[in-house]
Amino acid sequence: MLIDFRQVCGAGAAALALASPALADTTNLRVCASTKDAPFSDAQGAGFENKIAQVLADEMGATLDLVMLEKDAIYLVRDGIEKDLCDVLVGVDAGDERLLTTRPYYRSGYAFVTRQDRNFEGDKWQDVDQEGFDTFSYRLHSPAETILKYTGRYEYNLIYQASLTNFEDRRNKYTQVEASRVITEVADGGADLAIVFAPEAARYVRDSREPLRMTLITNEIERSDGVIIPLQYSQSVGVSKTHPELLGPIEQALQSGKARIDAILTEEGIPLLPSS
């Protein structure tokens, strides 16, 4: 199937938003994706979620219309789905209340990443508190921050973590550390350990010249107020609530294309967990 890449911005986005069909065209699968979300999605359409979107289109007998937004992925619902630039997002948390979600097509979780020669042992989040492991890389706005706070490592690590965004001012803007940077810091010895969502890290762990070890975290965090922070997540395809007629065909495509999707996840090196 052909992929129609469209860079959406400014007046072009507004014009597209006005063209809102009553029913989604099932021969043209409109999927929003970010140009800034590698390894999930990138401007070249080489992210593993971009590849899964192509599988869905193929299985549906549709043309993939991959609508690339030059925004961070957290804005895809607001600036893509809600503006009717697209109907589908690949790789959302199962049960995301902003969308209709399919049955999960994979499950994974947060992980520790270390150099193999560091001989790190442990699969509980509390295990970051080990002698000789003092510097931690992670993506902002993630459970990694809670883990470091609860183990007393957060404040000590602040200056190093800020250096990963070149000390960029985080006020009134969304700032993030690239997933690739989180892993290269470990490989190069800048960080002793990374705490990262495994699908974000797998490609870079796989391709690292320095042998790395990725270990899934097996327990969840219970905050001091009793709230549970899960560290394992099921991933689904999200569909706009204005186009529920797409949900069934996408569910069927996930089933008929399961072998191809599993092969993509395996090639990516993502550690998979049994469906919950």
UniProtKB/Swiss-Prot annotation:
It is found in: Periplasm. Its main location: periplasm. SMART domains: PBPb. InterPro entries: Methanol_oxidation_MoxJ, Solute-binding_3/MltF_N. Residues 1-24 form the signal peptide. The keyword Flavoprotein does not apply. GO terms for cellular component: periplasmic space. Keywords: Methanol utilization, Periplasm, Signal. Gene3D superfamilies: Periplasmic binding protein-like II. Transmembrane segments: none annotated. GO terms for biological process: methanol catabolic process. May be involved in the assemblage of active methanol dehydrogenase and/or its cofactor PQQ in the periplasm. NCBIfam families: ABC_MoxJ. PANTHER family: ARGININE-BINDING EXTRACELLULAR PROTEIN ARTP (PTHR35936:SF17), MEMBRANE-BOUND LYTIC MUREIN TRANSGLYCOSYLASE F (PTHR35936). This is Protein MoxJ.
